[in-house]
Amino acid sequence: DEKWIRNWNIALSVSSFGIALLVGALLGLTSMGLPINDNGDRVGGAFAWVSLPVLLGGLGFVGFSLVQGLAFVALKTDGDIRDRARNTLVRWAPVLLLPIVAWVLALDFTTGNGISWLCTILAVVAVLIAWISAKGGREGRAFAGLSVFLAFGALAIFTAMYPNVLPSTLDPAYSLTIANASS
């Protein structure tokens, strides 16, 4: 039944988008911080968590998921589908990956260190290799490059946050750190 297929395609698309947006938003939130007071309590209203880092994290995760999905489709198919996936990847990757790059750079500029900057540089090199590879029809290298980009991007985020587990946007002294989270 065509209606059944269409409805399930819509449900799958909307839920996939929603999950990617939610996971990215939560990662953006925990990496850039919450308004935590000296007692370790979150303060502010119900929407105190809504911020630019949450938006960057959500859109960054959605964008990366789309780009990595396009690379996978281009890698695993032939013919017109492969060409369309590769062409869409090459055309849209710079735009779709911009939020995740902005998120990593925002962290590096605020709390980064030498290791986080090195990871960021390696992530940028990996994504450039991935884009050039996709442009040249080397989908396997593009997929691998995007995977390396994700790994170094995540390392950049976590090394820039260290030793914080959950930064406070009110005062850095109120942040939840590895030391006080373990006790």
Question: Positions of the model-derived regions?
Answer:
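Short, membrane-exposed interhelical loops at transmembrane-helix boundaries
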Residues: L166-S183
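Long, contiguous internal "core" modules enriched in hydrophobic/ aromatic residues
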Residues: E2-A142, A156
